[in-house]
Amino acid sequence: MRYLLIVLAFVFGPINTDCVIASEAEDLHQYYVSYFDGKWIFEQDGTETVIECEGKQSYNHCSGFGGQLNELWGYDPVRKAWAGHGRGGDKVWEWVSDQHKGDAIKAGVSLSNVGKLWHPDGTEVSSKQLYTIIDDNSFEVQTWEQQDGQEEIVEPLVRARRVQ
């Protein structure tokens, strides 16, 4: 009987863990994609850029600049967080989102990401972002960047609005 219990623990333990991970991944996917899915206009320093985010079954794909910028967002089971990896121009980056609070992204919610940006020369830049949700159709993003041993740089504020 003892061997049967040990075998059952080895068989059903991983299955239960996979169910918890799948549930957490689905929750994060629903939380982020339900808000960010769609076409957005990002405005920074008077320049507007269209970014389109398309929710897929288990991830979110964002693109802009005629396909020159691409990001894939999805559940990272190692970090147990919503994470994004992207490439645009000659740079590559990754972001990891903080744990979400509440059932939905709505006005007044703040979201934060931490990440890294890599330049072609190998320079690595640490970054953090703060998203402030204004309403169902607009948000602002403040970004800070810092290279090793240098002062933190505050990037100009980005305002995003959903294309109706």
Residue ranges, per PLM feature:
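Hydrophobic/aromatic beta-strand elements that line small-molecule binding cavities or substrate pockets
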Residues: 48-53, 70-74, 94-103, 126-133, ...
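Edge beta-strand at a domain terminus
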Residues: 138-164
